[in-house]
Amino acid sequence: MLQSLAGSSCVRLVERHRSAWCFGFLVLGYLLYLVFGAVVFSSVELPYEDLLRQELRKLKRRFLEEHECLSEPQLEQFLGRVLEASNYGVSVLSNASGNWNWDFTSALFFASTVLSTTGYGHTVPLSDGGKAFCIIYSVIGIPFTLLFLTAVVQRVTVHVTRRPVLYFHIRWGFSKQVVAIVHAVLLGFVTVSCFFFIPAAVFSVLEDDWNFLESFYFCFISLSTIGLGDYVPGEGYNQKFRELYKIGITCYLLLGLIAMLVVLETFCELHELKKFRKMFYVKKDKDEDLVHIMEHDQLSFSSVTEQVAGLKEEQKQSEPFVASQSPPYEDGSADH
């Protein structure tokens, strides 16, 4: 009897604090994933770093042996200055003198990476005035970019995701959840093909020292806004039509980022993923927890825009992936 009471009380305790338990496991899982990544990266990259260090020491020792008139401190000072300039995107190589980092097209590419928070790091402001302007420009430009992307993604999502799903649901009678899942998978496949595989093949042809894997790596690092900066297109010494190439890359990165956000928004609106996310949200038991700062208690690109714009008609279609009463149509088909 006591055991059954204790068991039932434990079950009630777990159910009462289920959200807290799920959140705790989420934090633990994230920390373990961080540790897992660190272990894998360290085990894979550390041997290559050690080999590179040994190779550089051998080259340096051989160079000093062949040039006895040059002392090691002088060489260290020269190499330090070269590496410092390289961090600012300035190369000492003679065949790299023709590439300017701050002409208009390069500055346009830099501005796009700053506003999208990609930040490759291959080119950075040299002067104090440039650094100060970069701070002010980013403080204003990054929220402006978020507003711009929010508006674009909301409009694109209506035409690319919501209306097609609603059309197949009403016109053909398919389950809205099934249509939404199939549509999300197809949209993801098309996006990966158009903004990853095809551009990677193009970059592997245009960039002399890039293979397909390195090109695909650049596309992923860029469109996910990681922006490590180890691969930056258009920096080759014999790059033809460099200005036009830089403008094309800027357009590709902007369109690719919009496409990625549309796909992300499409998957986030799936009913199954919404239920999964709610497992980790705090349970609103108190009255003060029910007070919404915003009109909708959710954060998504489309919902934010709907709150700002107040588009009630679009708001009716903002939940196309859950079962709801279909709007009446005389012909049994959508009028759009």
From Swiss-Prot:
Q: Which residue ranges are recorded for the region named Disordered?
A: 310-336
Q: Which SUPFAM superfamilies match?
A: Voltage-gated potassium channels
Q: Which reaction does it catalyse?
A: K(+)(in) = K(+)(out); NH4(+)(in) = NH4(+)(out); Na(+)(in) = Na(+)(out); Rb(+)(in) = Rb(+)(out)
What GO CC annotations are associated with the protein?
Answer: apical plasma membrane; brush border membrane; dendrite; endosome; inward rectifier potassium channel complex; membrane; perikaryon; plasma membrane
Cytoplasmic-facing ranges: 1-20, 157-181, 268-336
Residues where Phosphoserine is found: S326
**Glycosylated residues?**
N95
* Tissue-wise expression: Detected in spiral ganglion neurons. Detected in hippocampus CA1 and CA1 regions and in the molecular layer of the dentate gyrus. Detected on hippocampus astrocytes. Highly expressed in the stria vascularis in the cochlea. Detected in pancreas islet beta cells. Detected in kidney, at brush border membranes in proximal tubules and in cytoplasmic structures in distal convoluted tubules, thick ascending limbs and collecting ducts (at protein level). Widely expressed. Detected in spiral ganglion cells.
Compartments reported by the entry: Cell membrane; Recycling endosome; Apical cell membrane; Cytoplasmic vesicle
- Extracellular side residue ranges read 42-103, 123-132, 203-211, 232-243
Give the bilayer topology.
Multi-pass membrane protein
**What result follows from mutating C69S?**
Abolishes formation of a disulfide-linked heterodimer with KCNK2
Q: Give the positions of the site Important for increased permeability to Na(+) when K(+) levels are subphysiological.
A: T118
Span list, region Selectivity filter 2: 225-230
Q: How is its activity regulated?
A: Inhibited by quinine, quinidine, barium, and internal acidification.
- Region annotation (Important for intracellular retention in recycling endosomes) maps to 293-299
Give the position(s) of the covalent cross-link described as Glycyl lysine isopeptide (Lys-Gly) (interchain with G-Cter in SUMO): K274
Protein modification = Sumoylation is controversial. Sumoylated by UBE2I. Not sumoylated when expressed in xenopus oocytes or mammalian cells. Sumoylation inactivates the channel, but does not interfere with expression at the cell membrane. Sumoylation of a single subunit is sufficient to silence the dimeric channel. Sumoylation of KCNK1 is sufficient to silence heterodimeric channels formed by KCNK1 and KCNK3 or KCNK9. Desumoylated by SENP1; this activates the channel. Desumoylated by SENP1; this strongly increases halothane-mediated activation of heterodimeric channels formed with KCNK9.
- Effect of a null allele: No visible phenotype on standard chow, excepting a lower urinary flow rate. Mice appear normal and are fertile. When kept on a low phosphate diet, both wild-type and mutant mice show strongly reduced urinary phosphate secretion. Still, mutant mice display higher fractional urinary phosphate secretion relative to wild-type, leading to reduced inorganic phosphate levels in blood plasma. The impaired phosphate homeostasis seems to be due to indirect effects on the expression of other transporters, such as SLC34A1 and AQP2.
Q: Which family is it part of? A: Belongs to the two pore domain potassium channel (TC 1.A.1.8) family.
Protein name per the record = Potassium channel subfamily K member 1
Q: Which organism is it from?
A: Mus musculus
Name the lineage.
Eukaryota, Metazoa, Chordata, Craniata, Vertebrata
